[in-house]
Amino acid sequence: MKAKVLKSKIANRLKRKRRIRAKISGCASLPRVSVFRSNRYLSVQAINDATATTLTSLSSKATGHKANKEGGAALGAAFAAKLKEVGISQIVFDRNGYQYHGVIAAFGDALRENEIKF
């Protein structure tokens, strides 16, 4: 991919990210779950925006999964268990400007299957 095209794709994702973040916010009882996807790994964290603290986080690098649909689903199930340990059953999902398909959708579906509402 040419550098100019790559820069515009990244700039467009960051614009989408800012639009999304202007509309959603998390608190202690309803945290924002932010997803970051790289080519190799997937990272997620539950954030309380009122105090700007991370409640819990998990990465596919730590769990040994890859950033594909199967890895996203496994990470979603593991993160749902971690959220339940902290006592969280409902979240606000922040897809971070990524399209809701593929690995991001697999992660979200795994959260829903494990009774996390968003």
Swiss-Prot record:
Q: Which GO terms describe its molecular function?
A: 5S rRNA binding; structural constituent of ribosome
Q: Which GO terms describe its cellular component?
A: cytosolic large ribosomal subunit
What the protein does?
Answer: This is one of the proteins that bind and probably mediate the attachment of the 5S RNA into the large ribosomal subunit, where it forms part of the central protuberance.
Q: What is this protein called?
A: Large ribosomal subunit protein uL18
Q: Does the keyword Transmembrane helix apply?
A: no
Q: Which HAMAP family match?
A: Ribosomal_uL18_B (MF_01337_B)
Superkingdom, according to UniProt? Bacteria
Family of this protein: Belongs to the universal ribosomal protein uL18 family.
Q: Which residues form the signal peptide?
A: none
Tell me one GO biological process term: translation
NCBIfam families per record: L18_bact (TIGR00060)
Any one Pfam family match given in the protein's UniProt record, by short name: Ribosomal_L18p
Q: Does the keyword Transcription regulation apply?
A: no
**How would you summarize the oligomeric state and partners of this protein?**
Part of the 50S ribosomal subunit; part of the 5S rRNA/L5/L18/L25 subcomplex. Contacts the 5S and 23S rRNAs.
What UniProt keywords apply to this chain's record, in alphabetical order?
A: Ribonucleoprotein, Ribosomal protein, RNA-binding, rRNA-binding
Which Gene3D superfamilies does the record associate with it?
3.30.420.100
